[in-house]
């Protein structure tokens, strides 16, 4: 009996050692050595305190900040422990009503007229996208500039500086990281004595 069990037990133990300890240890070590920031979650710090991750979207609702994509992750959205979409199809009346409500909110809050970029009123598959399109950022410039008493041209330039182009010039779409942009806004307000930063 043991003669037949021994090879299976040895193989199981070896595979547990390789796949459970050696391989993860090597990958973790290589990641910490080559890409320490990414390996630790792409965390963003402000004054020595972690304020978020460049990979996880956050809720911004006040007029002096750029707003990210809507979220369906968790009961109230933006729940990193419940990443996911709403799973509602295009014919679902609840989804249509929710999008219409978001459109109204964008129009009222930002005084927007004309077309609204889809990523500003629809949640992503993960519900935690950290980025918005440059068009969505441009749509919010006037509101943010007014709330912070900044020239619109200054805010527009800041958006351009925080726009990431396509990878290798062809992969993906240009995008703006909302958290990084909002932190840059705070830094700009802090260094401009004539600017009132609304908290």
Curated annotation (Swiss-Prot):
Segments crossing the lipid bilayer: 7-27
GO cellular component annotations of the record: plasma membrane
Domain of life: Bacteria
UniProt keyword list: ATP-binding, Cell inner membrane, Cell membrane, Ion transport, Membrane, Nucleotide-binding, Potassium, Potassium transport, Transmembrane, Transmembrane helix, Transport
S-S bonds: none
Segments forming a coiled coil: none
Localization per record: Cell inner membrane
GO molecular function: ATP binding; P-type potassium transmembrane transporter activity
Record bears the keyword Ion transport: yes
Membrane topology reported for the UniProt record: Single-pass membrane protein
Keyword Nucleotide-binding on entry: yes
Protein family (similarity comment): Belongs to the KdpC family.
Assembly and oligomerization: The system is composed of three essential subunits: KdpA, KdpB and KdpC.
Described function: Part of the high-affinity ATP-driven potassium transport (or Kdp) system, which catalyzes the hydrolysis of ATP coupled with the electrogenic transport of potassium into the cytoplasm. This subunit acts as a catalytic chaperone that increases the ATP-binding affinity of the ATP-hydrolyzing subunit KdpB by the formation of a transient KdpB/KdpC/ATP ternary complex.
Protein name (Swiss-Prot/TrEMBL): Potassium-transporting ATPase KdpC subunit
